[in-house]
């Protein structure tokens, strides 16, 4: 589609306020659950596939425009699978000097931990679906944890509520440790959400821009893990995705509280990603982990509260006490009007 046509469609979209006369609905097909706000946003969730967000679409001039890379595609694609794998209990690589990758040590015993953790590999089940005049939501619970109990010897429940509102999608993760655990349950957390680049049919992948005001960039060692090296960010303010290294993660942090990152498509569409937790790990903590491939056409602005190898180093780790409860909320907000205030002008 030509740029002029897309911009016209966006103008048509703006002629009706987002969320006007919305009638929220939930449908299920082939194991996937679709939340629709009856107006302009639709989200698809995949309980059998790690409980992940499998699709996120906006409606422009009566047509749905999918923004997620490889949305609802559960074939065997070559390369990155896309969508939005949930990273728990250890985003990134776990590494020990003696055993190498995919290992961690608890109470002196070496245990296995796959890259990005095991939650994305498990089946989740639907616990509740609900529609009101203000939202549609589905709550999923992770199952199959006993298969990993030798490597992660804790009892707990882990749920996510996908809540579609009139103007945004909210993900609410809840971790509750069993009161029978004999000590704190350590974990870190992330979401590998991956968007198409460009999201609409305008411009090139490298023309997508992102904005952050995080002062720090956390560097990885040759082993792929964070070992304490922090430098001033090389990506302040507005930056093109083309400035990011090819398929090499850029880890940003250095600020506490709610974390935000903006993404702007060449079409004029923008997304605001924000996340916050009921309690935070002590710094250093990666707040957003950026990963991109402009040749394949995707950009992952991943919300994290973690560092690579957190189970071994303790950096970015959340120690949840027996009987404790912890929540993490992510908001994904689309828009086409003026960008949210950033305090800086784009080039």
Q: Which residues does each PLM region occupy?
A:
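Sec-dependent signal peptide recognition
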Residues: 2-11
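N-terminal signal peptide c-region/cleavage motif recognized by signal peptidases
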Residues: 15-17
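Surface-exposed acidic/polar loop and edge beta-strand patches at domain peripheries
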Residues: 22-172, 178-347
């Amino acid at each position: 589609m030509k740029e002029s046509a897309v911009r016209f469609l966006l103008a048509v979209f703006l002629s009706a306020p987002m969320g006007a006369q919305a009638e929220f609905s939930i449908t299920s097909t082939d194991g996937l659950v679709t939340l629709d706000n009856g107006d302009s946003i639709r989200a698809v969730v995949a309980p059998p596939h790690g409980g992940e967000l499998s699709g996120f679409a906006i409606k422009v001039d009566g047509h749905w425009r999918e923004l997620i890379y490889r949305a609802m595609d559960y074939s065997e694609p070559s390369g990155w699978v896309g969508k939005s794998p949930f990273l728990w209990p250890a985003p990134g690589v776990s590494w020990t000097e003696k055993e190498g990758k995919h290992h961690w040590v608890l109470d002196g015993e070496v245990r296995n931990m796959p890259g990005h953790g095991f939650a994305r590999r498990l089946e989740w089940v639907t616990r509740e679906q609900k529609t009101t005049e203000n939202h549609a939501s589905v709550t999923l619970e992770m199952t199959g944890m006993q298969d990993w109990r030798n490597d992660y010897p804790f009892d707990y429940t882990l749920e996510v509520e996908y809540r579609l509102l009139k103007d945004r999608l909210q993900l609410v993760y809840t971790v509750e440790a069993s009161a029978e655990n004999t000590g704190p349950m350590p974990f870190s957390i992330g979401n590998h959400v991956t968007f198409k680049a460009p999201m609409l049919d305008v411009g090139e992948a490298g023309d997508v821009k992102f904005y952050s005001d995080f002062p720090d960039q956390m560097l990885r060692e040759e082993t792929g893990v964070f070992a304490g090296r922090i430098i001033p960010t090389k990506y302040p303010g507005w930056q093109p995705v083309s400035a990011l290294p090819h398929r090499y993660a850029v880890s940003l942090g250095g600020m506490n509280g709610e974390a935000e990152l903006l993404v702007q498509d060449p079409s004029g569409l923008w997304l605001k990603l924000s996340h916050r937790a009921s309690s935070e790990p002590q710094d250093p903590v990666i707040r957003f982990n950026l990963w991109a491939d402009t040749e394949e056409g995707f950009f992952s602005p991943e919300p994290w509260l973690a560092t690579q190898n957190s189970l071994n180093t303790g950096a970015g780790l959340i120690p949840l006490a027996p009987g404790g409860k912890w929540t993490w909320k992510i908001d994904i907000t689309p828009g086409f009007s003026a960008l949210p205030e950033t305090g800086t002008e784009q080039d």
